A protein has these predicted regions:
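Short, basic/aromatic-rich helical patch in the C-terminal catalytic core of site-specific tyrosine
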Residues: 8, 107-109
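Short, glycine/acidic-rich beta->alpha junctions
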Residues: 2, 100-101
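Transmembrane beta-barrel architecture of outer membranes
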Residues: 57-61, 102-106, 140, 148-150
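Gram-negative outer-membrane beta-barrel transporters
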Residues: 1-91, 154-158
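Outer-membrane beta-barrel domain signature
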Residues: 47-53, 93-98, 140-144
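C-terminal beta-signal and adjacent terminal beta-strands/loops
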Residues: 82-90, 111-159
Length: 159
């Protein structure tokens, strides 16, 4: 297998209260000499040139957070965005294992005072559905999907 790539993470504190973080990953992956029976039929084939499963070419993320004092408590907010390129989840690169690229946005805002906090949060705010995994083989194929847009409020107390 031959892999070439890099990852970049940048963090910047804009002010004492405001942080930014950016991540980027690039990956080029390919099997060079890959002799194997990928279908279970007992025949070994040359699979050189296939792309290893679950290896997206590009990934990207952005997060910003802000914290400030309000009254006797602390207000914290955070927004995150992530992108993952299309990829294939099957070792033989079966088209049924193709997973589309995805984008996702999550956010939280919370207030803490003394031992109590309340946080309003949202996951998958764009309600983008993504297949997380696909398994192909035998008589069955299956896949798992991410959670839909989910909103909530969390109340917490610590003692």
């Amino acid at each position: 297998m031959e892999m070439t790539g890099f990852e970049l993470e940048l963090m910047y504190q804009v002010t004492e209260a405001w942080d930014l973080m950016v991540t980027y990953g690039y990956l080029e992956a390919e099997y060079k000499d890959y002799l194997a029976d990928l279908t279970g039929d007992g025949i070994i084939t040359d699979n050189s040139g296939l792309i290893p499963r679950n290896t997206p070419e590009n990934t990207f993320g952005f997060t910003t957070s802000y914290t400030t004092q309000i009254g006797d408590g602390e207000l914290k907010g955070r927004i995150s965005y992530r992108f993952r390129d299309e990829m294939n989840s099957d070792s033989s690169n079966n088209p049924y294992g193709d997973l589309d690229s995805i984008e996702n946005v999550n956010a939280t805002i919370g207030y803490t005072i003394d031992n109590y906090s309340v946080t309003v949060w949202g996951r998958n705010l764009t309600d983008e559905r993504e297949q997380r995994w696909a398994t192909i083989g035998g008589l069955t194929s299956r896949g798992w999907w991410n959670e839909p847009q989910t909103l909530g409020i969390t109340f917490a107390a610590s003692y």
